[in-house]
């Protein structure tokens, strides 16, 4: 495991880094689906989802309706936990450590400190070491990813642009993170000090990424994945799994699309399988071109 956090003793209330990252590792190669009801959670589980994300409104609805988006009602989260046997994640606002405390008390399996909700703190993210439950956080570049890992994140996902059905931002973020990791791998030790300063991340963590060529945690992709081909695209580009939000339950045939995206994520390098599972899925979500989203409404720009 990485050198970060080795100094933090494990207590009854704090899961060790090894355990938290190991839990995230078990989701590798899978699809995590946004669900708003226990019925949707069952559809996701039956389709082969490796986990579900419990929330009141999918990102497309949050985007359309506006207003302040907060943590979901505990009754909704508990209903989804009771409905399925796979891990259940839930979202807390950036910096809102009390929402995270509530989610931990509800016994969710992962907390997503998410830019999809309205940020609670525009300067600080949650201190994730203080929790026993593992956190997943979004990143648009390597510096952001390393800062979240420094704060205790056990899984990183690209932010993409949630609720659009446009995969281009997720692709850009994944390419950026992977290109920046490759760049570190070719640097000499003295150059890594400057790189750490530029990335605003600890030198030890930067040196570890330079040595391994990978993040010390699992890297998933989120934001705009709407079709089996989208899922296979990001997997071929080096993602270790996929989050699908609005793309499934905003489409014409959610059960079929969910199963197809799971199959395409597993067989991501087999075009014949992807072609087969892409047939007859009905209407995809309508979607919004990211270029048409004005800067103040871009969710990926939340987080620092």
From Swiss-Prot:
InterPro entries: Aldolase_TIM, PdxS/SNZ, PdxS/SNZ_N, RibuloseP-bd_barrel. It catalyses: aldehydo-D-ribose 5-phosphate + D-glyceraldehyde 3-phosphate + L-glutamine = pyridoxal 5'-phosphate + L-glutamate + phosphate + 3 H2O + H(+). D-ribose 5-phosphate binds at residues 34, 163, 224, 245-246. It comes from the Bacteria. Its EC number is 4.3.3.6. The active site is at residue 91. GO terms for biological process: amino acid metabolic process; pyridoxal phosphate biosynthetic process; pyridoxine biosynthetic process. D-glyceraldehyde 3-phosphate binds at residue 175. Keywords: Lyase, Pyridoxal phosphate, Schiff base. Pathway: Cofactor biosynthesis; pyridoxal 5'-phosphate biosynthesis. GO terms for molecular function: pyridoxal 5'-phosphate synthase (glutamine hydrolysing) activity. Catalyzes the formation of pyridoxal 5'-phosphate from ribose 5-phosphate (RBP), glyceraldehyde 3-phosphate (G3P) and ammonia. The ammonia is provided by the PdxT subunit. Can also use ribulose 5-phosphate and dihydroxyacetone phosphate as substrates, resulting from enzyme-catalyzed isomerization of RBP and G3P, respectively. In the presence of PdxT, forms a dodecamer of heterodimers. Belongs to the PdxS/SNZ family. This is Pyridoxal 5'-phosphate synthase subunit PdxS. It comes from Cutibacterium acnes (strain DSM 16379 / KPA171202). The gene is pdxS.
